[in-house]
């Protein structure tokens, strides 16, 4: 559960994230490189570095996270449709959400540098863990 302090840190981090609109695509590229088995969920995508399809999907990832940041008090409702899509239509193994979250942390650390303090990292990790949990809810 996110404390008020965590929520404040998440909002502060997010204000910096939105200055880097390619963070989502970078996280996806890192995901595909580090965990190549995740490519199986994107058979119709050009997965090469700089691909328009990866860049566009990265924008969708960032938009979904932005929606979650705006709805920190009710993530389940904010992410319900996305959870349905991934569970029932796309049938994405929920472990992949955690893998993407790890990749997102690396991208944030790369772009934010010293602004991604241990406290900010811990709060954002709680946030991403909560997002992963909500996205996996429909699998039960």
Swiss-Prot record:
Keyword DNA-binding: no
Name listed for the protein in its UniProt record: Hemoglobin subunit alpha-D
Task of the protein: Involved in oxygen transport from the lung to the various peripheral tissues.
Assembly mode: Heterotetramer of two alpha-D chains and two beta chains.
Pfam families: Globin
Signal peptide boundaries: none
Gene Ontology MF annotations: haptoglobin binding; heme binding; metal ion binding; organic acid binding; oxygen binding; oxygen carrier activity; peroxidase activity
Annotated Globin domain residues: 1-140
Keywords: Heme, Iron, Metal-binding, Oxygen transport, Transport
Domain of life, source organism: Eukaryota
GO cellular component: blood microparticle; haptoglobin-hemoglobin complex; hemoglobin complex
Organism of this sequence: Columba livia
Tissue and organ expression note: Red blood cells.
BP GO terms, sorted: hydrogen peroxide catabolic process
Similarity section: Belongs to the globin family.
Annotated positions binding heme b: 57, 86
